[in-house]
Amino acid sequence: MFSRLSRSHSKALPIALGTVAIAAATAFYFANRNQHSFVFNESNKVFKGDDKWIDLPISKIEEESHDTRRFTFKLPTEDSEMGLVLASALFAKFVTPKGSNVVRPYTPVSDLSQKGHFQLVVKHYEGGKMTSHLFGLKPNDTVSFKGPIMKWKWQPNQFKSITLLGAGTGINPLYQLAHHIVENPNDKTKVNLLYGNKTPQDILLRKELDALKEKYPDKFNVTYFVDDKQDDQDFDGEISFISKDFIQEHVPGPKESTHLFVCGPPPFMNAYSGEKKSPKDQGELIGILNNLGYSKDQVFKF
């Protein structure tokens, strides 16, 4: 599955007893750190799953692409951790001049055990209330957050492999899932990411994704899809959408030990899986994945 993909598709991980105890404890930590890192730093958790909003200042704003920025938020202390677990997110809120609350979910792209700060990658949408507000902020301005919001309870080695299908900022929860899986030496799950964008310049988190692929070639693979490579002669990906034929050839089938995770804008979701009905209702599986024979229980929509 992780071999180089054909260009033909460019179209369509006493003393003896002490040693054993240490080894066992180490294995337990690595096997569980993705879901339960908060167990080891309970007092340092900022977000505890209650209804309390916490105002956090922006420490840095960086350009990620022509319409996307990376916001770094400072946690209360240098030893503070978010308190999130794998496949979870945060609510962000601001209050309009008329007193209305605008609330949106965001998935941090930082390591879950990162101390002192966390990062969000946010795309500006024309007419989007939250994104317009965020893009009008500057360092030291604050945003209110609460959480975590649980999305999916990941269990290491539950599947032999998983496939992540994403487009645009849909990469955020997929990247959080991918990099914590492949960096856990006790989780042997193979991760295959299919990521679509308009142009190579629109690919978000590309540096991080390429670094994962280089460091963990046996556990992680990413294929980029673009509508137009423009003048990027070094682009090494597919100049097409993520086709049904490509998925059928390069993704484990419905009868294998696999699971698929999908995240992207509404048209993308409708094409591959259908949208969720609500945060707690995945809705029916439609689109390309349904046509390929995958069941509703094999696909999760972020």
UniProtKB/Swiss-Prot annotation:
Coiled coil: none
GO biological process: cellular response to oxidative stress; ergosterol biosynthetic process
Chemical reaction(s) catalysed: 2 Fe(III)-[cytochrome b5] + NADH = 2 Fe(II)-[cytochrome b5] + NAD(+) + H(+)
E.C. number(s) listed in UniProt: 1.6.2.2
SUPFAM superfamilies reported in the protein's UniProt record: Ferredoxin reductase-like, C-terminal NADP-linked domain, Riboflavin synthase domain-like
Top EC class for this record: oxidoreductase
Domain FAD-binding FR-type residues, every copy: 51-155
GO terms under cellular component: mitochondrial intermembrane space; mitochondrial outer membrane; mitochondrion
Propeptide: 1-41
PTM info: There are two isoforms of NADH-cytochrome b5 reductase, a 34 kDa form (p34) and a 32 kDa form (p32). The p34 form becomes firmly anchored to the outer mitochondrial membrane after an incomplete translocation arrest. The p32 form is formed after translocation of the p34 precursor to the inner mitochondrial membrane, where it is processed by mitochondrial inner membrane peptidase (IMP) complex and released to the intermembrane space.
Transmembrane segments: 12-32
Residues at which FAD binds: 158-193
Induction (free text): By osmotic stress.
Entry function: The outer membrane form may mediate the reduction of outer membrane cytochrome b5. The soluble inter-membrane space form may transfer electrons from external NADH to cytochrome c, thereby mediating an antimycin-insensitive, energy-coupled oxidation of external NADH by yeast mitochondria. Involved in the reduction of D-erythroascorbyl free radicals. May play a minor role in complementing the function of CBR1 as a DPH3 reductase in the first step of diphthamide biosynthesis and tRNA Wobble base mcm5s 2U (5-methoxycarbonylmethyl-2-thiouridine) formation.
PANTHER family xrefs: NADH-CYTOCHROME B5 REDUCTASE (PTHR19370), NADH-CYTOCHROME B5 REDUCTASE 2 (PTHR19370:SF171)
The name this protein goes by in its record: NADH-cytochrome b5 reductase 2
This protein's encoding gene: MCR1
